[in-house]
Amino acid sequence: MLLPDLHPYTILLSIFIVLLLKQLVASIGKSTIKEFVWLVYLKVSSNQSIKTYNSKQHELHETNKEKRAISAQDEYAKWTKLNRQADKLSAELQKLNQEIQQQKASIDKVSNALLLVLTTLPIWVARVLYRNTHLFYIRQGIFPKYVEWVLALPFLPNGAVGLTIWMFAVNSVVSNFAFLVSFPFAKKVSKPVRDTKIE
């Protein structure tokens, strides 16, 4: 199989960036990212059903406002007409909402696929393609033989460090750094209070 001839440091940096991106996605949350993509889609889309939904929603709001302004007892005919119009608009909005929800589901699928392609797929492809690549070497004698053997996992000679160990190390460092950065902004936990016995 022909592999792209990448310098080991290119692999190191690429995997570092992908793992950093993966940690960023985990910190922000996939649902937040999908919601942001949906909001951007709503802003830039020229979809007619979204525009129709917004105009009908505005029309319903105005109709309800007008309906509340008049008395049902004093102007029954006008109030009934407005009530029918509001019911009709509500039914149309419900249909449009179902269409928009289907569009949202398809946008969510695309967002999920894009997140998968950007964060998970490169890691697995790199693990398969570059599992035998020596990323860097450690001088002999720095670590005991069994540590050198562990660092050389899965298929490398002692003294070499491969992609698996590099990914493990980068993941640990990035997740710990993300924790240290997010810890001061985390929600404070109240101090536990000991229950006192009442006799």
Swiss-Prot record:
Membrane-side (Cytoplasmic) residue stretches: 32-115, 178-199
Upper lineage: Eukaryota, Fungi, Dikarya, Ascomycota, Saccharomycotina
Compartments, record wording: Endoplasmic reticulum membrane; Golgi apparatus membrane
Topological category with respect to the lipid bilayer: Multi-pass membrane protein
Parts of the chain on the Lumenal side: 1-11, 137-160
PANTHER family tied to this protein: GUIDED ENTRY OF TAIL-ANCHORED PROTEINS FACTOR 1 (PTHR42650:SF1), TAIL-ANCHORED PROTEIN INSERTION RECEPTOR WRB (PTHR42650)
Subunit structure: Component of the Golgi to ER traffic (GET) complex, which is composed of GET1, GET2 and GET3. Within the complex, GET1 and GET2 form a heterotetramer which is stabilized by phosphatidylinositol binding and which binds to the GET3 homodimer.
Family under the similarity heading: Belongs to the WRB/GET1 family.
Keywords: Coiled coil, Endoplasmic reticulum, ER-Golgi transport, Golgi apparatus, Membrane, Transmembrane, Transmembrane helix, Transport
Keyword Aminoacyl-tRNA synthetase set for record: no
Protein's name according to its UniProt entry: Golgi to ER traffic protein 1
Role according to the record: Required for the post-translational delivery of tail-anchored (TA) proteins to the endoplasmic reticulum. Together with GET2, acts as a membrane receptor for soluble GET3, which recognizes and selectively binds the transmembrane domain of TA proteins in the cytosol. The GET complex cooperates with the HDEL receptor ERD2 to mediate the ATP-dependent retrieval of resident ER proteins that contain a C-terminal H-D-E-L retention signal from the Golgi to the ER.
Gene3D superfamilies named in the record: Helix hairpin bin
Protein's GO biological process: tail-anchored membrane protein insertion into ER membrane; vesicle-mediated transport
Positions of transmembrane segments: 12-31, 116-136, 161-177
Molecular-function GO terms, alphabetical: protein-membrane adaptor activity
GO cellular component: endoplasmic reticulum membrane; GET complex; Golgi membrane
Coiled-coil stretches: 66-116
